[in-house]
């Protein structure tokens, strides 16, 4: 085994499995903790990072991030489970978890300059999960930026020399609201733009957008 800096290596270069530098943390909600991540190179285009964390107050957490990069697609999935976490509401030990995932796909349609499709998932089973474990979670590109708002759905983008079309669907979950009011659904939505005619002094375009 060997120690290396805590970063996700370029998937195009040869990687080696091994322990990453340990991480020490202290938070008001969880107290002191230590993490000893392990990087596992599955193959040339796939790898995982196991990140077990032990807290002084007996709470235990394991976070696993999986990454795969193919010729026309990339997948990142981050799963974390915390055991024996004591909630302030009931003072009982419970388990908490999160799931973050993002899939980017280049559809490679003929006749199009760009043709991309993306899926994304953000889920937690406890409303204050992100606020409590934010400083403990390994930093990555798919962790929600807003600790009170989750977003799951998909989007796409098509572009050729004549027009462009984008659209998708979103499910927003506001963790600060009660169960009946927290969800906002935006699907489908679209944005269409077409070049109708070009002139010496400019262009004539048609644009349309909308959502349900």
PLM regions with names:
Residues 1-212:
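Outer-membrane beta-barrel proteins and related beta-barrel translocases across Gram-negative bacteria
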């Amino acid at each position: 085994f060997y120690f290396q800096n805590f970063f996700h290596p370029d998937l195009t270069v040869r990687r080696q499995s091994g322990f990453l530098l340990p991480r020490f943390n202290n938070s008001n909600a969880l107290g002191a903790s230590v993490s000893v991540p392990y990087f596992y190179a599955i193959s040339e285009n796939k790898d995982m990072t196991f990140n077990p964390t032990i807290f002084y107050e007996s709470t235990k957490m394991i976070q696993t991030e999986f990454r795969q990069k193919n010729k026309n697609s990339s997948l990142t999935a981050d799963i974390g489970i915390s055991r024996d976490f004591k909630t302030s509401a009931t003072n009982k030990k419970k388990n908490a978890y999160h799931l973050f995932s993002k899939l980017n796909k280049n559809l490679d349609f003929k006749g199009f300059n760009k043709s991309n499709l993306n899926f994304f998932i953000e889920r937690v089973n406890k409303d204050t999960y992100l606020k409590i474990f934010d400083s403990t979670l390994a930093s990555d590109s798919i962790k929600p930026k807003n600790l009170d708002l989750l977003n799951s759905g998909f989007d796409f983008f098509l572009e050729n020399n004549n027009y462009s079309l984008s659209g998708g669907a979103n499910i927003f979950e506001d963790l600060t609201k009660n169960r009946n009011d927290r969800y906002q659904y935006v699907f489908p939505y679209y944005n269409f733009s077409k070049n109708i005619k070009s002139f010496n002094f400019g262009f004539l375009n048609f644009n349309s957008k909308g959502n349900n």
